[in-house]
Amino acid sequence: MTLTKVELADNLIEKHGLNKSEAKALVEDFFEEIRVALEKGNDVKLSGFGNFELREKASRPGRNPKTGESVPVSARRVVVFKPGQKLRARVEKTKPKS
């Protein structure tokens, strides 16, 4: 199962009595703040949850899987999520659904 932004908003409505537009705006604003920080080149640290970090990837040779032709892959910046210790511990305790 995947948790969506709509489901996050629904959970806020249920747990905190927000109306639908407030909950949706809160979820959108939360993710927008993370996006803006990352666009500015800042890491995002959410205590008890984890960190979103920016990493620079160097250019490298790649390969077109269809043709086998060698293709250069340009340098780029990527976002990496590193879960915090508390999140890792909680996930490790949870039994996977079959």
UniProtKB/Swiss-Prot annotation:
Pfam families: Bac_DNA_binding. SMART domains: BHL. GO terms for biological process: DNA recombination; positive regulation of metabolic process; regulation of DNA-templated transcription; regulation of translation. GO terms for cellular component: cytosol. Transmembrane segments: none annotated. Keywords: DNA recombination, DNA-binding, Transcription, Transcription regulation, Translation regulation. GO terms for molecular function: DNA binding; structural constituent of chromatin. CDD domains: IHF_A. InterPro entries: Hist_DNA-bd (IPR000119), Histone-like_DNA-bd_CS (IPR020816), IHF-like_DNA-bd_dom_sf (IPR010992), IHF_alpha (IPR005684). It comes from the Bacteria. HAMAP family: IHF_alpha (MF_00380). Belongs to the bacterial histone-like protein family. This protein is one of the two subunits of integration host factor, a specific DNA-binding protein that functions in genetic recombination as well as in transcriptional and translational control. Heterodimer of an alpha and a beta chain. This is Integration host factor subunit alpha.
